[in-house]
């Protein structure tokens, strides 16, 4: 029996693998520049639970945060533009959608005098993209709203906004602006005057510093960064958004069911509260409630809802970078007080609950970015950005899998996707087909809609697909049951999605034939040969050379010799 062994070598160091690891694909971008991947180039990797690199994408511009995998196998990549209009840690500015074959389907820039994308994005189920942007405000605009001081030589105050992009036409179809939800208690001569503690749904414009003379994450110069949002996540069931503010040491939830007009006000949407905050947690002193004991979060990153089907579903999980001190971090989980209507009750004069949280892991620290994602089997995938260390722990905190490359790298965040993530129906499956540098004997193990070799094997060399009849024939499409030569410039893996091929009937000519099998391995003893035309011992595959085989593996093709024309069945 022919054994297939694929060796893919990158500059990596995998140190541990356990049987309890969640079987799936880890996606992350690895870069060498400060700021969690910003600056120079980077490489995005899709790696399976056996630590095999399934696919990689090279980028000329470094990552702003983590990439996102779509069910069609393309990725959404937020990256740093060369000359951002506003610059601080986590700066981005560009968002691309890149196919499995490395084609850029679209590329949008959000870097101008008004808006500058930074950190995270969030792909939505409808295909749109939520984008975090700084929104530039002058010192005078801030003073006119009651701000008392500006803490940077730019004389700017960068507010925040969330824009929803329809990538099919480049239009912004929904937006939320933090500037529409301010309060101040300085004077009734300014707008939004009120008692801060009576309005936890609003942001106190005088809370926190408005920028600095220099920023974290790469030694940026003067900036007007006030909130430093760094993560965004969407809850489909609630139609709500959660964001994380490092400089406020808080997370915030708002309603996404509003219109843009409602999002600018204080009424409308499922909550009836417009774009006001539905919930906030981490530092209630920001809205003049609670005390130092209630100040839990510090410079946190990576907040996200735990998905349905995973332990803790509906809870929030995040990486608390400064947990108790500026040199120790932790991954924590919290159960929000959300009710059946998607609202978050709060008592008068009290901070939002919960009073306590679930400690997931506390033996970790990273100054920049970082994140955590719960897996369906109960494990948690954690990323230490500074040390480029991704590791998966079980409920007892024991490491089940880890990735830590040698060299000076950073990884903003990583997340995993299940093996069944790619586009599938009840009748379809996804298969990984490995290939080596040079010529390979390949076959099509599934019924597919698009038979083009450029689509099925996008990393193959153009014009190198050949079948064999009475001689070699150049082809552009693959058919089930037929074998082909195809050339590749590098080792790798292709992912093919389609429906099962349970049985085949193949017509053969006298002499040598090039064939392929079904979705499942085919034992030669189970091949039907009613005419007795197969010459014994003449099934050959190709690896480093020709090899006699006993089993036809899916996705590969084989030579077989016959004594005459006829039909065989699997």
Regions found by a protein language model. Give the residues of each.
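Structural motif marking the loop-to-transmembrane transition
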Residues: 2-4, 114, 484
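Sec-dependent N-terminal signal peptides
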Residues: 4-15
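Short alpha-helical patches at coil-to-helix transitions and adjacent helical residues
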Residues: 14-16, 225, 555
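Short, surface-exposed loop and linker segments with low hydrophobicity and enrichment for Pro/Ser/Thr
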Residues: 15-24, 232, 457-460, 528-532
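Histidine-/acidic-rich catalytic cores in large beta-rich domains
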Residues: 19-427
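N-terminal exported-region signature
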Residues: 426-570
């Amino acid at each position: 029996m022919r054994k297939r062994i694929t060796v893919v070598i990158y500059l990596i160091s995998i140190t541990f693998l356990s049987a309890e690891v969640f079987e799936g694909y880890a996606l992350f971008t690895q870069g060498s520049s400060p700021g969690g991947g910003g600056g120079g180039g980077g490489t995005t990797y899709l790696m399976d639970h056996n630590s095999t690199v399934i696919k990689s994408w090279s980028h000329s511009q470094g990552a702003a945060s983590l990439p996102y995998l779509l069910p069609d196998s393309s990725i959404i990549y937020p990256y740093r533009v060369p000359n951002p209009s506003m610059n601080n840690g986590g700066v981005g500015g560009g968002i691309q959608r890149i196919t499995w074959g490395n084609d850029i389907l679209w590329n949008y820039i959000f870097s101008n005098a008004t808006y500058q994308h930074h950190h995270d994005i969030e792909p939505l189920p409808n295909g749109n993209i939520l984008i975090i942007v700084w929104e530039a405000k002058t010192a005078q605009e801030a003073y006119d709203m009651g701000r008392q001081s500006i803490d940077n030589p730019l004389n700017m105050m960068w507010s925040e906004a969330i824009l929803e992009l329809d990538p099919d036409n480049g239009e912004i179809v929904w937006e939320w602006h933090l500037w529409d939800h301010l309060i101040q208690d300085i004077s009734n001569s300014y707008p939004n005057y009120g008692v801060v503690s009576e309005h936890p749904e609003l942001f106190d414009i005088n809370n926190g510093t408005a920028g600095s003379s220099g920023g974290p994450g790469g030694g940026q110069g003067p900036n007007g960064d006030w909130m430093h949002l760094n993560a965004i996540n969407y809850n489909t069931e609630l139609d709500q958004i959660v964001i994380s503010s490092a400089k406020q040491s808080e997370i915030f939830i708002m309603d996404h069911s509003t219109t843009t007009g409602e999002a600018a006000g204080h009424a409308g949407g499922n909550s009836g509260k417009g774009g006001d905050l539905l919930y906030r947690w981490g530092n209630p002193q920001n809205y003049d409630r609670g005390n130092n004991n209630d100040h839990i979060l510090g410079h946190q990153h990576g907040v996200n809802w735990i998905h349905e089907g995973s332990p803790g579903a509906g809870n929030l999980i995040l990486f608390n970078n400064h947990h108790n001190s500026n040199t120790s971090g932790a991954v924590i989980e919290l159960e929000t007080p959300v009710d059946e209507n998607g609202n978050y009750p709060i008592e008068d004069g009290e901070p939002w609950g919960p009073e306590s949280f679930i400690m997931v892991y506390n033996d970790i620290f990273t100054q920049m970015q970082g994140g955590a994602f719960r897996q369906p089997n109960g494990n948690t995938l954690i990323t230490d950005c500074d040390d480029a260390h991704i590791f998966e722990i079980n409920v007892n905190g024991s490491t089940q899998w880890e990735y830590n490359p040698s060299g000076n790298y950073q990884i903003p965040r990583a997340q995993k996707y299940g093996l069944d993530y790619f586009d599938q129906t009840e009748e379809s499956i996804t298969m990984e087909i490995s290939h080596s540098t040079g010529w390979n004997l390949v076959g099509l193990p599934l019924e597919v809609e698009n038979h083009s070799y450029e689509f099925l094997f996008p990393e193959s060399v153009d014009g190198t697909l050949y079948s064999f009849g009475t001689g070699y024939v150049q082809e552009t499409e693959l058919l089930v049951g037929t074998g082909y030569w195809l050339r590749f410039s590098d080792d790798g893996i292709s992912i093919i999605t389609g429906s099962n091929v349970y049985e085949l009937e193949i017509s053969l000519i006298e002499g040598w034939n090039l064939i392929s099998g079904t979705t499942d391995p085919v034992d030669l003893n189970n091949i039907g040969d009613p005419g007795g035309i197969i010459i014994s011992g003449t099934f050959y595959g190709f690896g480093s050379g020709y090899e006699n085989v006993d089993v036809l593996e899916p996705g590969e093709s084989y030579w077989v010799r016959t004594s005459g024309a006829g039909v065989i069945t699997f």
